[in-house]
């Protein structure tokens, strides 16, 4: 049975194999977890909601962004330009400094948008990185997280997806 949908809830609950087709081409085919957590390219990542995408230089266990901010990775990589991604639900927010020192940043909440059961929270870190988190409303209340307030954000090295190839984002032009 083939079912076509843009509803990610349906994909995750009903689909055991997922295909992402964009521009008339099969971009990725696999189980839902792999497609959502390890997208094949930027197009698939953006389509499945991986909003935190960063172009960087990877070397060893570090990803270095152009603004000097670095992320700790879950493996070791040879020096190369890459794209990395972090899903919004993997970003943890806290009004108090967490114990973790890996991928820990301090920043200001610039927007809160309701997405049903969760809120999309956009933050700008002191280092100049824009991070999007997906947070349950109860966590917003208990963490005292509001627009204009500052808070801590963190994510584990395991939550960072390092894309196999670096493909620069290009504009699609009609001919």
Regions found by a protein language model. Give the residues of each.
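Short coil/loop residues immediately preceding or within conserved phosphate-binding loops
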Residues: 53, 104, 118
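Internal alpha/beta loop-helix hairpins
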Residues: 2-69
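Short, surface-exposed charged micro-motifs
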Residues: 55-57, 111, 122, 152
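A conserved hydrophobic position in a structured secondary element of the catalytic/binding core
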Residues: 21, 30, 86, 135, ...
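OB-fold (S1/OB) nucleic-acid-binding surfaces
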Residues: 64-69, 123-131
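Short, conserved beta-turn/loop elements at beta-strand boundaries and strand-helix junctions
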Residues: 63, 112-118
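Glycine/charge-rich catalytic "coupling/switch" loops of P-loop NTPases
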Residues: 67-113, 138-175
């Amino acid at each position: 049975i083939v079912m076509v949908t843009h509803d990610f809830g349906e994909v995750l609950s009903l689909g055991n194999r997922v295909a992402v087709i964009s521009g008339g081409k099969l971009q990725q085919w696999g189980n839902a977890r792999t497609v959502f957590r390890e997208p094949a390219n930027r197009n698939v990542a953006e389509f499945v909601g991986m909003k935190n995408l960063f172009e960087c230089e990877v070397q060893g266990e570090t990803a270095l962004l152009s603004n000097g901010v670095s992320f700790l990775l879950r493996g070791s990589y040879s020096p190369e330009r890459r794209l990395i991604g972090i899903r919004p639900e993997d970003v943890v927010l806290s009004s108090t400094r967490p114990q973790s020192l890996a991928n820990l940043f301090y920043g200001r909440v610039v927007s809160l948008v309701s997405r049903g059961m969760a809120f999309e929270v956009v933050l700008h870190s002191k280092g100049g990185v824009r991070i999007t988190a997906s947070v349950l409303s109860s966590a917003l209340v208990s963490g005292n997280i509001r627009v204009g307030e500052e808070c801590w954000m963190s994510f584990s090295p395991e939550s960072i997806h390092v894309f196999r190839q670096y493909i620069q984002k290009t504009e699609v032009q009609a001919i």
